[in-house]
């Protein structure tokens, strides 16, 4: 059996957000790649959460499964225009890191259950000065995520600016909670 390649370090910010998430939460790691967030969270908080990792990259998901066999994986083209078949009842928490596809943002927000959380961190305008990504299609404008959130989300944390670790970049972070329905 081949040992999977080492993971890149997880986002410290996402790890901090996880400290506030409820026990027993079902978490979707969206565009999970090799599992740097779901695997690290699963090891940091053993038995506290259950995970579904989705990505289109079969090799990355195979490495994730070898590393963390208890995590459910789903290979799917995240930019497919068909209805997503992996999200029948949504998730308590949705994690997105270093991924942006604007045409599906509304669908992505819809994956968060009522009372659930969204933790989104990706590159933003200005990152061109630091290299990849530099294509505007993959860079958020300041305030863009907040402006796109449905009205039933409350923003808990927001940042748009430069970071220096793990390497210099311009990023945007948004943590939000979807409000429970009022019956």
Regions found by a protein language model. Give the residues of each.
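Conserved SAM/SAH-binding beta-strand->alpha-helix loop
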Residues: 57-59
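Conserved beta-strand signature within the Rossmann-like core of class I S-adenosyl-L-methionine
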Residues: 116-126
């Amino acid at each position: 059996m081949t040992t999977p390649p080492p993971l890149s370090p997880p986002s410290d910010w996402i790890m901090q957000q996880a400290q506030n998430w409820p026990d027993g939460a079902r978490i979707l790691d969206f565009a999970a790649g090799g599992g740097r967030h779901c695997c690290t969270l699963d090891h940091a908080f053993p038995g506290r959460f259950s995970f579904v990792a989705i990505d289109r990259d079969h090799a990355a998901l195979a490495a994730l499964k070898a590393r963390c066999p208890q995590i459910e994986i789903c290979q799917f083209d995240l930019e497919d225009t068909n209805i997503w078949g992996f999200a029948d009842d949504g998730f308590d928490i949705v994690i997105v890191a270093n991924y942006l596809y604007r045409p599906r943002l509304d669908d992505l927000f819809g994956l968060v259950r009522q009372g659930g959380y969204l933790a989104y961190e990706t590159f933003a305008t200005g990152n061109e000065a630091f290299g990849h990504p530099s294509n505007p299609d993959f860079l958020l404008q300041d305030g863009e995520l907040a402006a796109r959130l449905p009205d039933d989300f409350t923003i808990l944390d927001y940042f748009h600016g430069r970071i220096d670790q793990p390497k210099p970049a311009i990023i945007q972070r948004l943590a939000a909670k979807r409000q429970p329905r009022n019956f």
